[in-house]
Amino acid sequence: MSKTVRGSCLCGAVSYAAERISDIVECHCAMCRKAAGGHAGFFFVAMRNEVSWEGEGKLTHYESSPGLIRSFCSRCGTAMTGANLKEPDDTIILSANALEGDVPARVIAQEFCASKATWFAGHDEAPEFDGPYPGWETLKP
């Protein structure tokens, strides 16, 4: 997608701007549900060199799994990224939960549906996968 999108945390201390983004994947794994504070985490991929941050120093980084880092606002706790490689590549997974306004993207898949919260009945027409979304490696802006 070629429209610059913006996202920010609840308190406004941290924000990102991404020049291009992929479509969105909805993750139902327990870690993403807890990090997002809801029934699922929503994430998209951007090129690392096309993302700019304001308040980046206010991010706290947490190794949620071996080799995977999540980042959130140290002031309000809003998740700003998904689980990114500790040794980063040219892409970054950002939290769509933090997006502002209209965006040129849509949910294209739901992953880890076997881990869905029992209280969540579902809502999307996006395909469901019991494990990880098999298209992550080809998902690009």
Where are the model-predicted features located?
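A short Gly-Trp-Pro
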Residues: 1-8, 13-141
